[in-house]
Regions:
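Helix-loop boundary and gating motifs at the non-cytosolic
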Residues: 4-61, 220-252
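Cytoplasmic helix-loop-helix junction between adjacent transmembrane helices
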Residues: 111, 117-156
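A late C-terminal transmembrane helix in Major Facilitator Superfamily
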Residues: 325-360
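Symmetry-related core transmembrane helices of the 12-TM Major Facilitator Superfamily/SLC fold
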Residues: 178-197, 362-384
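Central cavity-lining transmembrane alpha-helices of secondary-active solute carriers
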Residues: 55-74, 254-263
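C-terminal transmembrane helical hairpin of 12-TM major facilitator-type secondary transporters
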Residues: 273-317
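Intracellular juxtamembrane helix-capping segments at the cytosolic ends
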Residues: 127-141, 311-326
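C-terminal ends and interior cores of transmembrane alpha-helices
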Residues: 89-108, 281-295
Length: 391
């Protein structure tokens, strides 16, 4: 399968798939709302140093991996939709407790408690997202539509990277961080309701289910792709640690829309390698103009370039992971992609806050070095992928 585009089938877009896709959007928005807002709250209101705030934000990325080895056992042992629902509900409860402690009790958080909170939040989101993307979304469609379902649902999560921070910054500007807490809880609750509205028939568990395993968690033979994706997202995480305004994230959304159009019309008959190469070149261009230019046009061009680059890179890497998967490993490929994407953003964000302390030139140079390294690495990774793909 060397086609650049995923075909669109109207029959895929039935009520249940819409509910799952929107649930993915809302759940991911709830997480991304905290990217630009929580570091401000930690440093300005909680009195954390930049190093402490960066460690706390980065702890989320480590939490993502903690429960992954148990995903296969949990969805076999319990009803798969309930595993996602309860993990998402626990996320909402954790944020609700944080809101109560911050707003109602007016308590200052200890550093170690905040690290634990972020780590736990990451572990719960990782579990919910693995079950949602690796099992529930593809269970709502026919087998021949699964690649399209993965592709389409992932775009909802991608748009959350602009919608979430945009919403969070607007709430913080006009109401305060307490509104961010409450909206985060609200988004998760609505996502839970949407998942609950979809009927998933009972599936008889396998006879010999191991409690710990890589099934639905991590694709070992996709490790080179995983590292390449993570390097790219580290650079993006570093970039997002800068104090951008709502305008930046609104323009990122424009970039995502342009990426969708480009996939539909520009990359239709292009070489398979072209999307990722183009995306990385465009992101490099965004970093360069942020480094070297101060004109008003930069505020529009740079975030559009970043959104466009992320859009085409994310879509292509997702399909690469699917093509690497063997029989019954589609769900595992989705989880591996999600972990590379999310952990890269989280660790880049944490490093940017902890180490650069507002020194944007050094941070942008580091991000540029990472993206150039990723581009060089991709020339080898793509050849490796072409030899090892299974679909």
């Amino acid at each position: 399968m060397n086609s650049q585009n995923t075909p669109i089938h109207i029959r895929l877009w039935h009520h249940d798939f819409w509910r799952m896709a929107v649930a993915n959007l809302l759940l991911t928005m709830a997480v991304y709302m905290l990217i630009p807002t929580m570091p401000i709250w930690l440093t300005k209101q909680q009195g954390f140093s930049n190093l402490e705030a960066g460690i706390a934000m980065g702890a989320y990325g480590f939490g993502l991996f903690v429960l992954g080895a148990f995903v296969s056992y949990l969805v076999q042992r319990f009803r798969r939709n309930l595993v996602c629902i309860w993990s998402a509900a626990a996320m909402a409860a954790l944020v609700g407790v944080s809101y109560y402690s911050d707003v109602q009790l007016c308590r200052k958080y200890e550093f170690y408690w905040m690290v634990l909170q972020r780590f736990t939040f990451g572990s719960l989101f990782g579990l919910a997202q693995m079950v949602l993307t690796s099992t529930l979304i593809i269970d709502t469609c026919e087998s021949y539509q699964r690649t399209e379902a993965n592709h389409s649902a992932a775009w909802f999560g991608r748009f959350a990277l602009s919608l979430g921070p945009l919403t969070g910054l607007l709430l913080m500007r006009y109401i305060g961080f307490q509104a961010v807490w409450l909206t985060t809880v609200g988004l998760i609750v609505v996502a839970v309701v949407l998942i609950r509205l979809v009927h998933f028939p009972f599936r008889t568990p396998e006879d010999d289910v191991q409690m710990i395993g890589l099934d639905r968690f991590f694709l070992p033979h996709g490790f080179p792709l995983f590292i390449n994706l993570q390097l790219i997202m580290l650079a993006v995480g570093l970039l997002l640690s800068l104090p951008f305004s709502e305008h930046f994230y609104a323009m990122m959304m424009v970039g995502f829309l342009l990426a969708l159009l480009a996939q539909r019309f520009v990359f239709v008959d292009a070489e398979v390698k072209s999307e990722v190469v183009t995306g990385l070149i465009v992101i490099n261009a965004a970093l360069l103009i942020l480094l070297t230019r101060t004109q008003q046009i930069v505020a529009y061009a740079a975030p559009i370039f970043v959104g466009f680059g992320l859009g085409v890179i994310g879509s292509r890497f997702l399909l690469f992971f699917i093509k690497l998967s063997r029989h019954c490993q589609r769900g595992t490929s989705q989880s591996t992609f999600m972990l590379g994407w999310e952990s890269g953003i989280a660790w880049g964000l944490g490093l940017g806050i902890a180490l650069f302390n507002g020194h944007s030139q050094e941070l942008l140079l580091t991000a540029l070095t990472l993206t150039i390294t990723s581009l060089v690495m991709y020339n080898y990774t793509h050849n490796w992928f072409a030899k090892h793909k299974n679909r």
